Amino acid sequence: MKIHEYQGKEILRKFGVAVPRGKPVFSVDDAVKAAEELGGPVWVVKAQIHAGGRGKGGGVKVAKSLDQVREYSEQILGMQLVTHQTGPEGQKVNRLLIEEGADIKKELYVGLVIDRVSQKIVVMASSEGGMDVEEVAEKTPELIHKIAVDPATGLKDAEADELATKIGVPAASLPQARAILQGLYKAFWETDASLAEINPLILTGDGKVIALDAKFNFDSNALFRHPEIVAYRDLDEEDPAEVEASKFDLAYISLDGNIGCLVNGAGLAMATMDTIKLFGGEPANFLDVGGGATTEKVTEAFKIMLKNPNLTAILVNIFGGIMRCDVIAEGVIAASKAVSLKVPLVVRMKGTNEDLGKKMLAESGLPIIAADSMEEAAQKVVAAAAGKA
């Protein structure tokens, strides 16, 4: 789960991380009012969407008068903001963050992720923060410094100081940088985050260290113990199909192709998509119905896939372990009838009650294309999607 920058800063503030004063707003008039309350002479008008690269996309503007605050708010609020993370369609800006300006002397970068190899949280930092940190990581990886943190001790003072020194924080500002690094680590740990970034972390002209941005992603499997994080969820920022799928415990991710995939098991789902691409097709989605799929879940899965206007065929690929093939067959038949299926449907089943499932499909009277192997299923669905079946 992702949250907005201003929400991330609320979390950072709770953990003692210095952030600029700011106010989230939903209208142009409120933006001007917020700027008046914050006081000038400089403000930053920032689009709030769940994507990076807002500055390059025109979603962050520095205003030097209240008239400019109004002008920039009118420009940004309601725009389709296109960044390298949104795709060509962009994301609509429904809210802004009006923030006090800062005297930026140097931009740094700090981020935390989980390293699954070492099974530790890794703190990354660079002296080259700002909008082009991805380019820095790609072209000059030696400028990215890392520390794997022992979970038994947390981020120690010496580790924080070493990292801060490597990225150019002067000695006089080390206590502030240490507090920010340790606060960010503690926030990451206590909220079950999967990613946390401050980009940029700035040094000001008078030696202050301030988090000028905040990005958090959270482990969705841990949200049950963080109702305060769930309260930050903004459904307007999420794919409507993915939101609908989550209501039925379906793991669904929209993709850019035209072949719908309904599979049980994440590994098999990824292998299925790879095989479709191997034979020249493009998956329209990732969809894992899990091991406890019911007729209702399969029907809802079909409904969600069919809302995609680009869909031209569907592949159902089932390995019957915990999930019985006859249950899936029953669901496929019911779903096909319920939605009046008009696109070609390829079904491949292996495992528990496989013969019964195949018999049910064959006797259903529906124009279902059967396949015995994943390769055959992929070839058939690619051909069907192209109108060659």
UniProtKB/Swiss-Prot annotation:
Keywords: ATP-binding, Ligase, Magnesium, Metal-binding, Nucleotide-binding, Tricarboxylic acid cycle. Pfam families: ATP-grasp_2, Ligase_CoA. Its cofactor is Mg(2+). InterPro entries: ATP-grasp, ATP-grasp_succ-CoA_synth-type, ATP_grasp_subdomain_1, Succ-CoA_synthase_bsu_CS, SUCC_ACL_C, Succ_CoA_ligase-like_bsu, Succinyl-CoA_synth-like. ATP binds at residues 46, 53-55, 99, 102, 107. The keyword Isomerase does not apply. Succinyl-CoA synthetase functions in the citric acid cycle (TCA), coupling the hydrolysis of succinyl-CoA to the synthesis of either ATP or GTP and thus represents the only step of substrate-level phosphorylation in the TCA. The beta subunit provides nucleotide specificity of the enzyme and binds the substrate succinate, while the binding sites for coenzyme A and phosphate are found in the alpha subunit. PROSITE patterns: ATP_GRASP, SUCCINYL_COA_LIG_3. Pathway: Carbohydrate metabolism; tricarboxylic acid cycle; succinate from succinyl-CoA (ligase route): step 1/1. One of its GO terms (biological process) is tricarboxylic acid cycle. It comes from Paraburkholderia phytofirmans (strain DSM 17436 / LMG 22146 / PsJN). It comes from the Bacteria. This is Succinate--CoA ligase [ADP-forming] subunit beta. PANTHER family: SUCCINATE--COA LIGASE [GDP-FORMING] SUBUNIT BETA, MITOCHONDRIAL (PTHR11815:SF10), SUCCINYL-COA SYNTHETASE BETA CHAIN (PTHR11815). Gene3D superfamilies: ATP-grasp fold, A domain, ATP-grasp fold, B domain, Succinyl-CoA synthetase domains. Its EC number is 6.2.1.5. It is an enzyme of class 6 (ligase).
